[in-house]
Amino acid sequence: MAAVKKHLRFALVAAITIALLVAGSVADESSEDIDNIVIKTPLDIPRCDSPLCSLFRIGLCGDKCFCVPLPIVGICVPSV
């Protein structure tokens, strides 16, 4: 049970890190257009159909999310 919690905690940290990296790369590309800043709230971010996914079963996350592979399972991350 402790190993599962450890992997889920790692998955959450990985998802947050990836989301921040994606947001940072998007911000770097559009730094010239300061008038077009859009701040997304949790209500604007799409919900995934499932929190966990597998690369062997495509489509578990839904249309607006993608699967981030981890050592055992993957996690669904919203496409922002």
Curated annotation (Swiss-Prot):
Residues spanning the signal sequence: 1-27
Parts of the chain that traverse the membrane: none
S-S pairs: C48-C65, C53-C67, C61-C76
Keyword ATP-binding: no
Subcellular localization: Secreted
Gene Ontology cellular-component annotations: extracellular region
Propeptide: 28-44
GO molecular function: sodium channel regulator activity; toxin activity
Keyword flag Signal: yes
GO biological process assignments: defense response
Domain of life: Eukaryota
Organ and tissue specificity: Expressed in trichomes, that are stiff epidermal hairs located on the surface of petioles and leaves. Not expressed in other aerial parts.
Keywords associated with the record: Disulfide bond, Ion channel impairing toxin, Knottin, Neurotoxin, Plant defense, Secreted, Signal, Toxin, Voltage-gated sodium channel impairing toxin
Family label: Belongs to the gympietide family.
Written domain comment of the UniProt record: The presence of a 'disulfide through disulfide knot' structurally defines this protein as a knottin.
Note in the entry: The name 'gympietide' is derived from the name in the Gubbi-Gubbi language for the stinging trees (gympie-gympie).
Described purpose of this protein according to its UniProt entry: Neurotoxin certainly responsible for the defensive, persistent, and painful stings of the giant stinging tree. Inhibits inactivation of Nav1.7/SCN9A sodium channel in sensory neurons by directly interacting with TMEM233, a newly described Nav-interacting protein. Has virtually no effect on Nav1.7/SCN9A function in heterologous expression systems and in neurons that do not express TMEM233. Also weakly but significantly affects Nav1.8/SCN10A. Coexpression of TMEM233 with Nav also confers ExTxA sensitivity to Nav1.1-Nav1.6.
UniProt protein name: Moroidotoxin A
